[in-house]
Amino acid sequence: MSGNDYYEILEVSRNASAEEIKKSYRKMVFKYHPDKNPGDKKAEEKFKKISEAYEVLSNPEKRAAYDRYGHSTFTSGGASGFDFTSGFSTDFSDIFQDFFGGGFGKSQRASSREHLRGSDLRYDVEVSLEDAFKGIKVPISYVTNVKCSSCSGIGSEGAVNSVKCGNCNGAGSVRTRKGFLTIEEVCNVCNGEGEVIKNKCRRCGGSGRVRNEVSLLVTVPKGIETGNKVRVNGKGEAGFRGAQEGDLYVYIRVKEHKFFTRRSSDLHCSVPIKMTIAALGGEIEMPSIDGSWTKLKIPEGTQSGDQIRMRGKGMPEVNSKDRRGDMYVHVTVETPVKLTKQQVDLLKKFEEESSANCSPKYQGFFQKIKDIWRDISSG
């Protein structure tokens, strides 16, 4: 190995804390790992140096000796040489857990039944906006692994009669070589149990579970939105040989409504009103999401594009007993068509008698245009 300074190799200062050393090591070991750099001899050599440096600096006693006596103490001529090919004493389990698809060692895998837990499942449900408003129970059906009824999930005929697994010799895990590392993985014969059932259940073959259809009612709470999910505990895949069941996650999609547009807990809608109501004010009846009709007051002088707020007429908030959003009514003033002669005469008379105060935006707009042209002409 090269005589490079261990602190320089790990890119830390000599007074770096143990956590800083570990953090830098994790970052560098991912970058230079041989499996991520196949055929790259420089990366392989760098990885060896990183591992050697961390082997020393992560150990308080070795680090103290290194700081006191220098690098030669840990080379082949020193008191504690580092043999890379013999394997690491460093625990890589937390570092490479995701890198190799799982943890290392029996302590994490074979000693726990967590890996035997059934998988979580996903189911997609579409509901109407009205159903999302009031809440609904939705019947669903799906096929998955369920607990075997013949053996009650234990996987054996009668009392369990187990023998040591011949594949892992009872360890629950097997070791395989991956480049420079020895990787410990769950035994695929006994699934980490270390033993196999001698008198396997004929129906499930010893797994404790069989394929079957599951039917249930899922409660969709009021106020639910697209993208929300409902968790149903224990309704996922059955665990292996009596291990914990997974959960079912029901993902919700709320259909688009023909009249209302939803924004969080608020509802928006567009409503046309007559010109006379817009000018004089009045009341119109509005449909609500709960199916009822509500009177909406239109202020005099209402313009197209104005927005009128109806408090508490929106969607209920999830997990709230009484709180609701608001409904926003976007007004469009409709110009009358197919007028009678009398109506035309009345409008002409109105136009003759109208002043600038009646249409301030209109008058202001054309006055602004006149001013612009006057400035251009005078210039």
Curated annotation (Swiss-Prot):
Binds 2 Zn(2+) ions per monomer. Pfam families: DnaJ, DnaJ_C, DnaJ_CXXCXGXG. Zn(2+) 1 binds at C148, C151, C201, C204. One of its GO terms (molecular function) is ATP binding. It is found in: Cytoplasm. Its cofactor is Zn(2+). It comes from the Bacteria. One of its GO terms (cellular component) is cytoplasm. A zinc finger (CR-type) spans 135-213. Residues 5-70 form the J domain. Belongs to the DnaJ family. NCBIfam families: DnaJ_bact, PRK10767.1. This is Chaperone protein DnaJ. The gene is dnaJ.
